[in-house]
Each structure stands twice: as structure tokens, then as C-alpha cells.
From Swiss-Prot:
Reactions catalysed: uridine(38/39/40) in tRNA = pseudouridine(38/39/40) in tRNA
Catalytic-site annotation from UniProt: D51 (nucleophile)
Identification of the protein by name: tRNA pseudouridine synthase A
Listed GO biological process terms: tRNA pseudouridine synthesis
Top EC class, one word: isomerase
EC number(s) reported in the record: 5.4.99.12
Annotated organism of origin: Pyrococcus abyssi (strain GE5 / Orsay)
Family stated for the protein in its record: Belongs to the tRNA pseudouridine synthase TruA family.
Residues the entry annotates as binding substrate: Y106
InterPro entries, sorted: PsdUridine_synth_cat_dom_sf (IPR020103), PsdUridine_synth_TruA (IPR001406), PsdUridine_synth_TruA_a/b_dom (IPR020097), PsdUridine_synth_TruA_C (IPR020095), TruA/RsuA/RluB/E/F_N (IPR020094)
Any GO MF annotation of the entry: RNA binding
Length: 263
């Protein structure tokens, strides 16, 4: 049978998703957990090989196995740290998590201090539709034409969230779009300049750099006719452990925020 897992992970704890010799990676930890649980498997495939520092709430991996234990997320969760299996379902035998994906949804969390939010919202709409994103990606030989289906900008406290949905993305594409929007919000890049870059009018030496990977979250990967019901026990474990990390980090973050406000 073919089993697909919806997984979440804290990307700041890993050297990226893909296995690398002598480095801790998301893929490496999942494979280690499969081996330690005694689950025999083959044809391990993933939907997105996120970069170092990038986190996920809804990445998807799949294996072929005859072991029913694979359908219980807690079997692997008991052997995982910083990675959480939120759902495990049986899928068609030819399922490939990357090629079957209908769309991917990313969110970037950007401090809104000093940003003109309305300008960011205005410029963000320029990216909708089909464009050549060579100015907003790390070119690796692939076709640089992509289509963005949706882009939304909204605030959550002192954070500006930029959510982008598309069928596929180029390397560093989301982070470079975010950086361009940040520069717009700071008044250092205009909407007209972004429009020109999307039309190919730019110097390669002056491409927009990527925003830091730590602010990027792979929220979801959508499939036609395939749903991932969350496992109750897995969800409780995930929320408990992530809430504890949030409590630890929010104290330091708001301490620094208050220092700014007090002066």
C-alpha cells in the first residue's frame, strides 16, 4: 500500500529537508524513525525539499509499505523530535506528493516596524498571474515562468504576514518576493520598479536578495480529492510542544519590543 504523511517541523532545528551526510535534516530524521520503528518501506518521496531554516505545517511525504503501523502517526511521533506526523492516510499506489500537488501555500512572517503596510499590499498585487520570476529567484536552469494564484497581506500584532499560493515555486522565489515587498514598505523600492523587474528590465547584479529563511512557513499542500484528517493524539502532542516553544520565545521577543516602546 501507499501511505502519505502530512508533517510539520521546526526548520530552525535542521540543515534543510533533504538528507545530507553528517548533518541533521528533516528527511533523515523521518527515515531514522521509520527504520527504528521496524517499518519496512520503499519509494520514499517528498512534496517539498525546504531550505535550511524553513519550517512547515503541511509538507507531505509518502512511502510504499505493507506495515499497518505506518497508518498510526504516533508510532513515528514517539521516535521523532522537532518533527510531527499530523496525519497518515492510504493513497493511490502511484501517488507522488510533488507531482500530484494542486497548489502550495506559504506564509512569511515579517516585522511590520517601519513598514508602510498599504504600500506593501499595493505592490503585492503586481505578482499575481503569470510572470517571468527570474528577478525573484535563484536561477537553477529551470523555466522561470510561474503563475501566482493568490497573494494576501495582513497584520497580526507587530507582524506582517504575506501569504502566497501557487502550483509551484522557484528556488528562493517566495523569500525574494517578500524581500522586494519589504523594500517597498520601507520606501527603497517602488511598485514601478517591481513591474519592470517582472518584465525582465533589471541588471542581474542588482537582483533582490532573499529574506531570511527563518520567517518562512510552508502552510499547506493541496491535492485534488485527497484530504488529510488530523490525528487527535498527534495534534495534542504537536500543540503541547509548540506552545511550550512559543512561550519561551515570546518572552524574549516582547521584552525587546517593549524596550523599543519605552524609549
Amino acid at each position: 500500500m501507499r501511505v502519505a504523511f502530512k508533517i510539520a517541523y521546526d526548520g530552525t532545528r535542521f540543515h534543510g529537508f533533504q538528507r545530507q551526510p553528517n548533518l541533521r535534516t528533516v528527511e533523515g530524521e523521518i527515515i531514522k524513525a521509520l527504520n527504528n520503528s521496524g517499518i519496512m518501506y520503499s519509494d520514499f518521496k517528498s512534496a517539498s525539499r525546504t531550505d535550511r531554516g524553513v519550517s512547515a505545517l503541511g509538507n507531505v511525504v509518502a512511502i510504499t509499505t505493507e506495515d499497518e503501523k505506518a497508518l498510526n502517526p504516533m508510532v513515528l511521533n514517539a521516535r521523532l523530535e522537532d518533527v510531527w506526523i499530523l496525519s497518515a492516510i492510504e493513497v493511490p499506489q502511484d501517488f507522488h506528493p510533488r507531482f500530484w500537488a494542486k497548489s502550495k501555500v506559504y506564509r512569511y512572517y515579517l516585522p511590520s516596524i517601519g513598514l508602510e503596510v498599504e504600500k506593501v499590499k499595493e505592490c503585492s498585487q503586481l505578482f499575481l498571474g503569470v510572470h517571468d520570476f527570474s528577478a525573484f529567484s535563484r536561477v537553477d536552469g529551470r523555466d522561470t515562468v510561474r503563475s501566482i494564484d493568490r497573494i494576501e497581506v495582513f497584520t497580526l500584532g507587530p507582524i506582517l504576514i504575506i501569504e502566497i499560493e501557487a502550483k509551484s515555486f522557484l528556488w528562493e522565489m517566495v523569500r525574494r518576493i517578500v524581500k522586494a515587498l519589504e523594500l517597498c514598505g520601507l520606501g527603497r523600492l517602488s511598485c514601478e520598479e517591481i513591474k519592470e523587474m517582472l518584465e525582465g528590465k533589471f541588471e542581474k547584479s542588482k537582483k533582490v536578495p532573499p529574506a531570511p529563511p527563518e520567517g518562512l512557513l510552508l502552510v499547506d499542500i493541496k491535492y485534488e480529492g485527497i484530504e488529510f484528517p488530523l490525528n487527535d493524539k498527534a495534534l495534542k502532542k504537536f500543540k503541547r510542544e509548540v506552545e511550550e516553544r512559543f512561550r519561551q520565545k515570546i518572552m524574549g521577543a516582547y521584552l525587546l519590543w517593549d524596550m523599543i516602546q519605552l524609549l
